Amino acid sequence: MKRIVVGITGASGTIYAVDLLEKLHQRPDVEVHLVMSAWAKKNLELETDYSLAQLTALADATYRANDQGAAIASGSFLNDGMVIVPASMKTVAGIAYGFGDNLISRAADVTIKEQRKLVIVPRETPLSVIHLENLTKLAKLGAQIIPPIPAFYNHPQSIQDLVNHQTMKILDAFHIHNETDRRWEGD
C-alpha cells in the first residue's frame, strides 16, 4: 500500500488537485492524506463545482492547515512522499527556506529531511528570478518540479484532456501505474 500526502495551496489550478484525488481514490492500493490551505478551499469554490465535503471524501485522512501536531508533520509518519498541487509561490518559498509555518510547508520540510519523494506543481506565470531560484533550490534538494505544461502530441480536445496529462505525470513520479492519458510512442 502506498501512502501519499497531498497538499493543496491557494494558487489557481485546483482542478489539478481534484483530478489527482479522484484518480488516487479509485486505487485501493493508495492511502491519501490531505491538507488544504484556506485559499485552496476558496479556490475550490471559485474554480470547480466540488464542495469541500466532496473533495475531502476522496482522501483517507484530512488535516487542518494549522495543525502542526498532525501525523504528517512528523518524520516517524511513514509515507511514500508528498505532492503539492497546485503550489503557490509563497509555499514554494517557505519550503525552500525551511519555514514550516503551516502544515503544508512543515510536511514538505519533513519529506525533504526524510529524503522522500516531494513533487511540486507550481502554478504561476510569468516566473520571476525569485520564483526560479526557489524552485531550483528545491530541485537541488531532490524535489521533482512538474509544472502544469500541456502536451499536444495527444491532440487534447478539452480542458480535462490537458488535466489528465498532468495527472499522469504526477502519478508517474510516484511510480503509480496509470493510463490517465495517451503516452508518446514515437512517430
From Swiss-Prot:
Protein residues bound to FMN: G10, A11, S12, S37, S88, M89, K90, T91, R123
EC number: 2.5.1.129
Catalytic activity: dimethylallyl phosphate + FMNH2 = prenylated FMNH2 + phosphate
The keyword Flavoprotein appears for this protein: yes
Superkingdom of source: Bacteria
Covalent S-S links between cysteines: none
Keywords: Flavoprotein, FMN, Prenyltransferase, Transferase
Gene3D superfamilies reported in the protein's UniProt record: Flavin prenyltransferase-like
Role, per record: Involved in tannin degradation. Flavin prenyltransferase that catalyzes the synthesis of the prenylated FMN cofactor (prenyl-FMN) for gallate decarboxylase LpdC. The prenyltransferase is metal-independent and links a dimethylallyl moiety from dimethylallyl monophosphate (DMAP) to the flavin N5 and C6 atoms of FMN.
PANTHER family (UniProt xref): FLAVIN PRENYLTRANSFERASE, FLAVIN PRENYLTRANSFERASE PAD1, MITOCHONDRIAL
Note from the entry: Gallate decarboxylase does not form a complex composed of Lpdc, LpdB and LpdD. The term subunit has been used in reference to the three-gene operon. Gallate decarboxylase LpdC is the only protein required to yield the gallate decarboxylase activity.
Protein name in UniProt: Flavin prenyltransferase LpdB
Name of the gene: lpdB
